Amino acid sequence: MRHPLVKNAEDRMNKAVEKISEELRKMRTGRPSPAILEEIKVDYYGAQTPISQLATVNITEDRALIIKPWDRSVLSSIEKAIFASDLGLTPQNDGNVIRLTFPTPTTEQRQKWAKKAKEIAEQGKIAIRNIRRDILKELKGDTKDGKISEDDEKRIEKEIQDLTDKKILEIDKLLEKKEKEIMEV
């Protein structure tokens, strides 16, 4: 049976990996993805509403996203929200839909995005190591208090280290996949 500290560490590490995965997924790459619009909120009748709740977002073959709101009165609000975001894209409003064209990124831009992806991954690794440190500190306290034998402490330490290594490897794989996606022309 797994020790509760190992279970706690695994739950916390899984959440950290999921958060990093989500951050990387939302990052802009050279190709259009509806995920980059998830953080943009539109003022809709006084409420900050995600674009995905106001419109359908489709990808076209020519490196563009088409945003088609269900209520055309919200077109200008969506356009303003995209302008105000830090995406660096210029929305084109034709009265029915908003078109976001993704220019082919320069090598310099791709390198900048890859660097940002590495920073995000490194934050995730630091979070994993901090979780390990906290759990091991708790484990040492339990051993000192006599709740856990020294043999069990060593076994649990090894389990936590193996778990840490596994989660850091997961983050490395997520980063590798994202870097490949970024550098693809």
Swiss-Prot record:
Coiled coil: none annotated. InterPro entries: Ribosome_recyc_fac (IPR002661), Ribosome_recyc_fac_dom (IPR023584), RRF_sf (IPR036191). Its main location: cytoplasm. It is found in: Cytoplasm. Pfam families: RRF. One of its GO terms (biological process) is translational termination. GO terms for molecular function: ribosomal large subunit binding. GO terms for cellular component: cytoplasm. Keywords: Cytoplasm, Protein biosynthesis. Belongs to the RRF family. NCBIfam families: frr. Responsible for the release of ribosomes from messenger RNA at the termination of protein biosynthesis. May increase the efficiency of translation by recycling ribosomes from one round of translation to another. This is Ribosome-recycling factor. It comes from Pseudothermotoga lettingae (strain ATCC BAA-301 / DSM 14385 / NBRC 107922 / TMO).
